[in-house]
Structures are given as C-alpha cells and as structure tokens.
Amino acid sequence: MKPRAECCSPKFWLVLAVLAVSGSRARSQKSPPSIGIAVILVGTSDEVAIKDAHEKDDFHHLSVVPRVELVAMNETDPKSIITRICDLMSDRKIQGVVFADDTDQEAIAQILDFISAQTLTPILGIHGGSSMIMADKDESSMFFQFGPSIEQQASVMLNIMEEYDWYIFSIVTTYFPGYQDFVNKIRSTIENSFVGWELEEVLLLDMSLDDGDSKIQNQLKKLQSPIILLYCTKEEATYIFEVANSVGLTGYGYTWIVPSLVAGDTDTVPAEFPTGLISVSYDEWDYGLPARVRDGIAIITTAASDMLSEHSFIPEPKSSCYNTHEKRIYQSNMLNRYLINVTFEGRNLSFSEDGYQMHPKLVIILLNKERKWERVGKWKDKSLQMKYYVWPRMCPETEEQEDDHLSIVTLEEAPFVIVESVDPLSGTCMRNTVPCQKRIVTENKTDEEPGYIKKCCKGFCIDILKKISKSVKFTYDLYLVTNGKHGKKINGTWNGMIGEVVMKRAYMAVGSLTINEERSEVVDFSVPFIETGISVMVSRSNGTVSPSAFLEPFSADVWVMMFVMLLIVSAVAVFVFEYFSPVGYNRCLADGREPGGPSFTIGKAIWLLWGLVFNNSVPVQNPKGTTSKIMVSVWAFFAVIFLASYTANLAAFMIQEEYVDQVSGLSDKKFQRPNDFSPPFRFGTVPNGSTERNIRNNYAEMHAYMGKFNQRGVDDALLSLKTGKLDAFIYDAAVLNYMAGRDEGCKLVTIGSGKVFASTGYGIAIQKDSGWKRQVDLAILQLFGDGEMEELEALWLTGICHNEKNEVMSSQLDIDNMAGVFYMLGAAMALSLITFICEHLFYWQFRHCFMGVCSGKPGMVFSISRGIYSCIHGVAIEERQSVMNSPTATMNNTHSNILRLLRTAKNMANLSGVNGSPQSALDFIRRESSVYDISEHRRSFTHSDCKSYNNPPCEENLFSDYISEVERTFGNLQLKDSNVYQDHYHHHHRPHSIGSASSIDGLYDCDNPPFTTQSRSISKKPLDIGLPSSKHSQLSDLYGKFSFKSDRYSGHDDLIRSDVSDISTHTVTYGNIEGNAAKRRKQQYKDSLKKRPASAKSRREFDEIELAYRRRPPRSPDHKRYFRDKEGLRDFYLDQFRTKENSPHWEHVDLTDIYKERSDDFKRDSVSGGGPCTNRSHIKHGTGDKHGVVSGVPAPWEKNLTNVEWEDRSGGNFCRSCPSKLHNYSTTVTGQNSGRQACIRCEACKKAGNLYDISEDNSLQELDQPAAPVAVTSNASTTKYPQSPTNSKAQKKNRNKLRRQHSYDTFVDLQKEEAALAPRSVSLKDKGRFMDGSPYAHMFEMSAGESTFANNKSSVPTAGHHHHNNPGGGYMLSKSLYPDRVTQNPFIPTFGDDQCLLHGSKSYFFRQPTVAGASKARPDFRALVTNKPVVSALHGAVPARFQKDICIGNQSNPCVPNNKNPRAFNGSSNGHVYEKLSSIESDV
C-alpha cells in the first residue's frame, strides 16, 4: 500500500507535469526537416572553395535545410561512379547528387543519367564531362545538366555568322548522338529566316572506318565555303582538323565554328585546332565551379521546400539502389515537377524537359595566336554581344602580304554615307546596304570588351565602294569612325578617318573626304570621284504680307475703272434706260410705274450691279425695260470675268514674300565685317574639317569670329538656320547642294545656285605606299567612262528642290495674310459709325433749319427737292401755290374716266381668277364729298361713314404713342398742307377712314394739349353726315373699342368678320401726350418730317387722287364754304381733349348682352319701319352729348354761324358724285327733298351713268327707293322712309349676276386711273367657265328666299342674321375658297389681339347664335353680305362700315343709290388700304 501511495502523491504528479512541459518545448524547438545532398567532385577541384560555398547561410529562408555531404573521388570509370553513389545512398541517406568533374569524357553524363533513372534520385551535372551534351536521356531519369542544348548552340552559331554577314557556309558532322538535331535545327532556322542564307554542303563523316583518312579527305575537299560548322566530340574534332589542314581548309579565308562539345576543357587545347577557331562554350569566367555547386544545392533544396509547402512531405531517402517500390516512383515524379521550375535569388534556374537549362550563360571563345581560348562575345537573354566589330584575321605573318580582305573605315554624312538600323524582323541589312559596325563608348568598357552595335550603311560613296571592290576583287569589313570626323592633326597625331588609316587600323577610308595637301602627306588619295569646294547655305526668311495684298491682283487703275464703270457709267446707264423705257418704271421714280408698285432708283441700280459683281445673294430690284436688262446682262458677263481673274491671282499675292540673304563669296563684307550690320551677321561651319582649315589659313579674322557659331554637325547647322540662330552656314558644296535639294519645304538654298569657292574634290584615302592605289584609280576612271558615275550622282545628289522643279507648297493663311481685309472692315465700321453720328446730328439738330423751320420759309432741302421734281415732271413751283391745284386734278374728268373705265374693265376681264379666287380685291363704294379727316396725315381716302364714333374716356398712358402721332400731325397741318409734305414714318399700321373712331380717340390726352388745324376743302355738308343715331352710339363705341376674333379658332363655328386689309398687319402701338403742347409745337413738326418707310409709299397715289378731288376749283363764286372755321374747329378739338370728371376708364365688357341689345334695337327699328335713311337720334362725339352734331343744327365749333351761313353750308344743292353746284335745286330741307338730298346728281354724272349701263355690284344689295315723302315722327331726330314695292321689283331686275375678285394690278390701275368710276366687277366671258363643273357653279344663283329681302320694310337687316339661314338670301359673298376676311385667317393680328396683349387677357368676344325667328323677322344688312356680323378688327381705328353708301341717321342728304349711277372711286374702300409688297414681284 505504501509504494502505491507514493505513486499517487502530489510530488509525483508535479514531476509528470514538468516532464510533459519539457517534452512539448523540445518538440516545439525541433529543427526544420532536412534533405541530404551529396556533392561529388572528380579530379583536382578546389574542395575548400566548395566547402565555403555550401556552408554559407544562404538557405535559412527555406522550409527545408540542406544537409550536404562532400565526396571526392579520382576514378571516372562507370563502375567506380556507380559504386560510390550507391554507397552514399545506403550509408548517408542522401536524396540528391551534385556531380562535377574536370574531364572531357561525355560518357560520364551517360552514366549519371543511368543511375538517376534506376534510383529515381535527382542528379545535377554542373561541370566537365557531366555537363556535356547528351542527346537521348531516359524518360524516367531526373538528370539535369548545367549547359546549353544542341538547339541552343546551333542558334548561337547562326547569330555569330549573321553578326559578321557570313551567309555562305557548310556543315560537317559525325555520327555522335545529337547530330541529326543539330542539322535539323540549322535547316529549319535558315528556311524560316529573312536572311539570305546559303547552305552549300552537309558532310557526314564516318570515323569508324579503318581507311577513313582518305575518304574523309576526299569529302573535305568538296568544301568551298569560307564558313564551316562542325559537330562532333573533341577527339573526333582533333582528327578532322588534322585532315582539313592537309587539304588547306584551316588557313586564311576559312573560319570554323564548333559547339562546346568540341572545345571541352579550355585549359587543354589540342595542337591540331586551327588558330581563329570559334566555339560556343559555357561561361567559365563569370560562372565558376563554386557558383555552380551553390546553385545545384539551391535547386534541389528549393524544389523540396516547395513540395513540402504544398504536400507536407518530402521524398524519403533512398536506402539502397535496388528494390524500388511504387511509393518511391510517385514521390520522385512529384519532385521532378518542382525541379524543372526553380527560381533562386531572383535568377531563373529552370530546366527544359530534356534536362538542359532554359537560360544558360554562354560565351563565344576564340583560339587566338597564342593558342589560348579568348572570350570574344557573350550570349545573354537571346542577344549576342561581340568584342570585335571587325573580325580579326588570324593568319601567319608571311601570308599578310597576300590578304585581299580589307578593313575600311567610313564616316556618316548624307548623302555620301547614310547609316540605318538593321531590319527588325530579320536582324540583318537589306540588299542595297552594307553591314557596318558602330562602336559604343561606355564608361565601364575595357580594352578587351569594347561595345558596338551593328548598323547598315548606304549612300553615294558606299555604292562606289561596292563597284570598286567588285572590279578590283577584294572583300572588306566596314566600320564607322568614332575618333573625330574626317581627320585633323592635333598635337602631331591624326584623328578621324585619316588617323585610322595612318595607324593602319584600316586599309582605306571612304566617304566625304576632301583632298588637301596636309592630308596627302600622310596618306595616298585616289583620283577625285566628285568635284566639290566651299559653298554657303542660307535660309529663306518669311517676309511680311502687305495689308493691301488683297487689292494687289488688280492695279489701282483697274480698281478705279471698275468703280467708275459701276457707279457712273453702268448704274446710270441702267437707270436712264429704265427711266425712259416704255415698259419699265416710266417716269415714276418714287413709286414705280403703278401706284404702290416697286420703285427703281439709282441707288437700287448700284446695289444690283454691286451684287452681280461679287455674287452676293442680296434682295435687289430688277429692271423691267429690255434695254436695261441687256445692260445688266452685259454687266453680269463682265462681273464673271472680273471675279474669276481676281480669284485666280489672289493666292499669288496673299502668300508671304520670302527674303534670302545675298552673299557674293567668302570675301563678302558680311563675312569680313559682320559687326557692321544690325543685327550682326552670324555664320559658322563644322570644325576639324577642310573647310575650317581653308578659312583658318586664308581668313584669320573671319575664323576667329565664327568660332562661337561653329556647329557640331551638318544637321545641327541646318536646324540653326531654320530657327534663326544662324544666318549662314559654310561647308562643302556637295553636301550643301544635297541638303538644299532634299530640304523639307525648300527653305534652305545655296548662294548663287551652288556657287563653289576653293574648288577641290572627294577621294579615297589609302595607306601610304599601298599596292591598292593604282587599282582603285583605274576602277574610278572606269566608272566615269561607263557613265555609271553620272547615274550615281543623279540617284543620290539630286534633290526635289533642284532645278526649280519643286512644287508649290500649300499652307494655311494666317492673320498676317488676311490683315488687309480686316483693316478694311474696321475702317468701314469706323466710317459707318461716323456716318451714323452725323446722320443723327443732322436729323435731330440741323435738319429743321434746312427744312425752313428756323426761318419760317421753305428750306434749302425742300427747295432742291421741289426743283428736281419740277424739272422731271415739268411742273412750275410757285411759292404760294394753292393746295387745291394739282396736275392730277384732271383725273375726275368725266370723258377721260369713261375711257379709262373701258380699258380697266378689259384688264379686269383678262385677269380673272388671279390667285385662285374670283372675289373682288376691294369693295368699291360711291365717292362723295369727304368731311374733314382729322387723321389726314395718314393720307387715306376717307368719307362719311354710317357709323357713330363714340369716343372712350381718357386713360393715362394707354394710347400715348398713338396720341403723340396725332399731336404731331395736328400741330403742323397748315405747313404740311402748304408744302404737300407728309409724315408716314409711324402711320402705316392700318387703314383709316373719316369715320374712324380712332381718329378721334387719338386726340384725347389728359394734358389737354392745344392743336392747330387747317381748314380743308370739302362739300357743304354737315360733319355728322351718314352717322347713325345716338341710340346705337354706345354699341359703336364698343365696336371701336374691341376687335372681334372668330370663334372658328376658339372652338365655335361662328365667324366674326373683320374689315382689316390683308396687308395691313402692323401692330398698333399707343402712347400718351405729356407736357405743354405749346412748347412741343416745333418738335411736333420736326417729328412729322421723319423719313417714311417703304411701306408708306404705296399710299401716295391715294393721296394725289384725294388731293386732286379737294383741289378742284370751286364751281361757285363763294368758295369759302369749302373751309370750316379754323378757330371753331380748333376749340372743338381742344374741348375733346380735356379731362372729364367721373369719366370711366377702359375695362373689359361682355359683348354678348350688348350684341343682343343691338339686335333688339334693329328689330324695333324694323317693326317701326325704319330704313337706311331713317332719321335717328343725334350722334355723340367724344364722351358727352354736349358735343353732338345733329342734322340741321350747327356743329359745336360752328355755333357762331348765322342761320343763312349754316343753311348755305349744309344745303343739298351739290351733286352727289361731284361738288358741282345744282343751281335749279331747292335748298329747303323738308319732305322728300330732305330725305333725298344726297342722291341728287348733276346732268353730266347722270349721262355718264346711263351711257355705259354696266351692271356691277361688289357687295351692294339693291335697297328700295323711298316712294313717298318722309314721315316725320314726333321725335325730331327720327325720319321714316317708306319703300315702294314697284321700285323694289325694278331694282331686283337689275341685280348683278357676276362678281370677281380683282387682282392687285387691276386694283392699282383703278386707284390711279379709274378713281372716279367704279370698274366692272367681272368679265362676262368668265361666267360660263364658272357655271359648269365648278365649285362656284351656284354662286350666281339666287337663294330660294331672295325675294324676302325685297319685301322687307327695312332695308337694313340685323347684324346677327346668318347668310345661309337668311330667307332673303342674296348672292354668295365670294366664289373663292380662300378666307373672305381677315378674321378667318388666324395668322393676321387684329386690334382686339393688341388689346388682349395690352390687358393680359384672351380674346373676349364670341358670337352667340341668334334665334332664327328673329333673324327672319328683322334681317340685317350685314347678314346679306356675310354669314357673320361684320365687326371691324380695327374698331377704335376704323368703324364698321356698311357695304357701299348705305347711310343711316339724321342727315341732310340721305340716300340709297342704285347701281346705274356712276360712282366716284373711293380709295378708302371700306377702311382698307391695300399695299403691294416689294417681294411679291420679280421681273427677271
């Protein structure tokens, strides 16, 4: 029990814990696994060096530690090697072997391969026979060699031959294993190469025959190539070289190249080996035995470490060379994969599948004259580096005299010697080039290993060398000189090419070598092969382009003649021809041939010809006359020739002129005294050449000055010339001529086209007293005799810039080239600005004095203008000529108008259907005496309208612009009328009539400005003639206040028509008058003198017709009745402009109820028998009734007139069509005479109307004539006119049947020529065309209920009556498919749109449908014309007008004219002013 207790005591457990901890620590501190490697050295290897190599701590970073066993042995027989390795495996448990020997026995490699295949142990042969080439290895072997493969050595041999351009060779081999691989590698390489290889012979020698000497000798005699490749063992090579020497294949001119297998141990050289033998060998100099042992151990250890890291085990050690089991095979195969791919210390130590290194360290060794192997090259990273750029010829001293292979030095200098790189694909030079070597000077170079690179040379001198060598029969090695250039003697020693020849490193020197006396003392020169000397090269400097270069294609005389012919001759000729042409703008210089038509002035003629010269697409006015057109055509031909000639010569003058420094020679002042010029003249040359020597010997001062400008080479000198650092370059003429000919852009030239100073020549330098001189001279002379030298000169020395054959180089034009054009534009803009300022100064400051405002008399400008007009038109201008007299006063002559009417009717018939519509272009109305037009400055044809004009209240700043226009007009009426001068600049927005509400609205101003007016000649009729009663004055005010847009474009079917002209689309602007009018009277007149735009010119014919009418001499002795009281009228208008208290401002009004109210008013009038001549309530003017004008009552401004004067002024004893006095007419304003006063006409008008009874009616509906005296109701302001059924039937019988729309040209003729008579509406010959098969076939037929209209008691139907629902019917408004009125066109702005924009609202009136019954019971006159209420889009400017002269209201002369009476033409035509656009017509 006691012993058991001791075992279980705590002390026992403590001991166990300590043992456990110590055991765990021991396991944790256990060393990493190790691998046994045996290093076997055979021979006298340095064991100490090897021990130091593997004992270094270089493998501590690996997971496996190498355990190296050094073994030394002397026997190299197979049995000894096998026994020793097997003993090491059983005793030392080795897992790898590193084997090295110092023998040349390739059999050792075969033994090691056998052992590795049997024991599955990795073996590395690192030196000696163990590393020699072994062709066929066992598949299971892990034998690796530190040496190149057969294929690698064959590639290195080919690179050596390629380096020295040895392309012709032969192959000699024995039956040693691997010879087939060697030959196959050579053949495959040369077949797939771009180099022109020539494999002459492949000899396979059998060394086993007893009588082989004679056979081998016979085979070797077949060899003729200078390069021979040999593949065999070292022993076999000794015998082969002995036989080759006997047949003369080892002497001078033959080069043998052998692999490392032949060279073997470099310490032992057989005596049979020829001098100059080249071998590819493993590097023994930089990669010695200790380094190889260290790398061998590292390879095996690294592979085991990688295997352990991935698989956690390493191969088990081999205990015996026998009984190999499967597990050992698996482990060895796995280790073999890691041995192939090994990288140690950043170096790739991998092996190929055949057991050779992938990147071996190879060297090229040469057996020199001392019978020692000399390293002359290195193969590294698949590139060859050789020591000698020219291969040395190793031959006996006695044979040196007979050497025909020469070493030649040259110098790069185009075009004589041009150096290029080798072909990147083949690594060789092309056929037309010669290989040449260029040394590389590096800091680390040694005399034994100078670096160089292979280049290819060509050029003029190289071609001469090739021809000479072929003629003289010698070969050569060419290299580039690195010590200097051509050659200069420094401190008694020559450098450059001359120095190479003097030092006998080269036999000849070929290049651009100048012959001189100093060089001829040390070398011999051949005859010159090219003449040269000293020449000077300069650069073409860019000159400046003149700012007037764009004008230089033509001389100043040509430019002056062109402008004179344009401005004076051609333009004036075209204008004169057009002026006098019967088909041109005949004598109407201002407005063209037709009123409102285009004009043709001298300015337009100049503009036309200017546009033709420069082919500018500008809008021009073409002439109409044949003569002027011919003139323009001839000018166009001139313009083509002029512009083509200018364009063809422009480029020559826009380029920069080049400047070249002119130098006469080396004695020129610029060379001898360069500092006398500013800046100093800079010149230089390339030092150490014949040029510098010549200058130094002859021009010492010049040589001293040019030293600081000397250049390192020709290329540097050319660059300095182009960049402006050098002004002249002095050098050999041959070189400079070539450079000038090949210069890009031909900017470099030689003075005097290659002028040469100090002529000499280029020659070939040969060693002194050499036997080659005579042969070379004869060869050069032969080249001259055969003409080959000229061919070479043409090939190499002629450039593209020579002989002035260079092409013109195109270049971009910069700002310098185009500066003159920009200067001209800048000057034009400056001149335009000055003209603009002068124009404004004259217009705002000096114009008024020239116009006569300052002196109160006609100014100079006015006098000149009227004088020109008098000369052109033959009209005498009197200073105080009556405004009633005018050359156009005869236009109202009755007989003349009849003839014009016939001609116009014919023209209208010929122009039917113009623009696709037969509708009339203008509704002609009867002309009657016009009341005073307060907007006379607009020059529209205006007369009384059957509308009241109720003026809206004044609102500040609402219509200030428009009021200011009216103020300017009325402030200068007297002077304006006397001078017949008008202001149309701001007054062409829209047409106006005398009844225009805006004509009065525009006069309202919150500041009550005073106005001065001039009385006007009108018939003696009241101002309110034709105005409706005051009952509807509010409605007319709303019509004038708003414009009505059709709801056709707003979602409704009804259409509200507008009487606005299709051309009058100008937006109306409004303003207000501020300030004291008395201070502005003068300024108002100044504003009225503003220049009119072209759009206002079309109204001039209207004005002249109207003035002719008004200026007609009075028919009565008392002509004062044509003028109203000036002061009274002025006071009346002043009263209109005063601010009214409690007057409402502008506001939006719902017109629906108002429109209905108007319909009701017409209905009541119809029921009560009201007619067109019904006398209604008094008419309101302005904003109150106190200014109303009632029939028979004097106007407010005429309240001071006596009853006799008023009766005389308002009487009806004047013709309705003309202001002729009716002497036999009673002036009693009662009864029927009161109702038909305005319908009375004189005998002449009646006869004219009955002479040609052409039934026409554009929109006039036959209204019943009153048959009984007017019944005066209790209301003094209302008069009723009953209708006669009989008369209605007669009128119905005479109703028009045809209607057409006038073309614009016809309308213009009517304006100018047929102003007094309305033209025939449509040609009768077109009626048949419209009747059948036409969409207008039924437009001439009466509707079913057309008789209803004649039976109506009231001749004025309701405004809301629809045409298609109207029982009365009537004709269709138009047979045209185009919109009849402007409100049907949504693209024409109206007055209402302007109001909407002004107040920020949308269109605010839409027609409400009316009751059919009401329409039938009370037809409206507007409904007979259109199916929409005729609401003017210019209300507020022009009130709505009835068609023709349907007068409504209490008036002294109300009437409804029938269509048989002649009617004077009214230019206002329902408020329209038609204006022809200049862009519509094209005459060419």
Swiss-Prot record:
Site (Functional determinant of NMDA receptors): N615
Region: Disordered, residue numbers: 1074-1097, 1161-1194, 1271-1301
Effect of A636P: Severely reduced localization to cell membrane
Keywords recorded for this protein, A-Z: Calcium, Cell membrane, Cell projection, Chromosomal rearrangement, Cytoplasm, Cytoskeleton, Disease variant, Disulfide bond, Endosome, Epilepsy, Glycoprotein, Intellectual disability, Ion channel, Ion transport, Ligand-gated ion channel, Lysosome, Magnesium, Membrane, Metal-binding, Phosphoprotein, Postsynaptic cell membrane, Receptor, Signal, Synapse, Transmembrane, Transmembrane helix, Transport, Zinc
Modified residues annotated as Phosphotyrosine in this record: Y962, Y1039, Y1109, Y1133, Y1155, Y1474
Intramembrane segment spans (from-to): 602-613
Chain residues that bind Zn(2+): H127, E284
Outcome following mutation: A652G: No significant effect on glutamate and glycine agonist potency
Reported tissue expression: Primarily found in the fronto-parieto-temporal cortex and hippocampus pyramidal cells, lower expression in the basal ganglia.
GO cellular component: cell surface; cytoplasm; cytoskeleton; dendrite; endoplasmic reticulum membrane; late endosome; lysosome; neuron projection
Mutation effect (N615I): In DEE27; severe phenotype with early onset seizures; gain of function mutation; results in neuronal hyperexcitability; the mutant channel is not inhibited by magnesium and has increased calcium permeability compared to wild-type
Phenotype upon changing P553R: Changed glutamate-gated calcium ion channel activity characterized by increased glutamate and glycine potency and slowed response rise time and deactivation time course
Domain of life: Eukaryota
Positions of glycan attachment: N74, N341, N348, N444, N491, N542, N688
UniProt-reported outcome of changing N649T: Affects glutamate-gated calcium ion channel activity resulting in increased agonist potency and mutant channels activated at lower glutamate and glycine concentrations
Extracellular-facing ranges: 27-555, 648-819
Signal peptide range in chain numbering: 1-26
Disease implication from the record: Intellectual developmental disorder, autosomal dominant 6, with or without seizures: A disorder characterized by significantly below average general intellectual functioning associated with impairments in adaptive behavior and manifested during the developmental period. MRD6 additional features may include seizures, hypotonia, abnormal movements, such as dystonia, and autistic features. Developmental and epileptic encephalopathy 27: A form of epileptic encephalopathy, a heterogeneous group of severe early-onset epilepsies characterized by refractory seizures, neurodevelopmental impairment, and poor prognosis. Development is normal prior to seizure onset, after which cognitive and motor delays become apparent.
Oligomer status and interactors: Heterotetramer. Forms heterotetrameric channels composed of two GluN1/zeta subunits (GRIN1), and two identical GluN2/epsilon subunits (GRIN2A, GRIN2B, GRIN2C or GRIN2D) or GluN3 subunits (GRIN3A or GRIN3B) (in vitro). Can also form heterotetrameric channels that contain at least two GluN1 subunits and at least two different GluN2 subunits (or a combination of one GluN2 and one GluN3 subunits) (in vitro). In vivo, the subunit composition may depend on the expression levels of the different subunits. Found in a complex with GRIN1 and GRIN3B. Found in a complex with GRIN1, GRIN3A and PPP2CB.
PANTHER family: IONOTROPIC GLUTAMATE RECEPTOR
Name of protein: Glutamate receptor ionotropic, NMDA 2B
Source organism: Homo sapiens
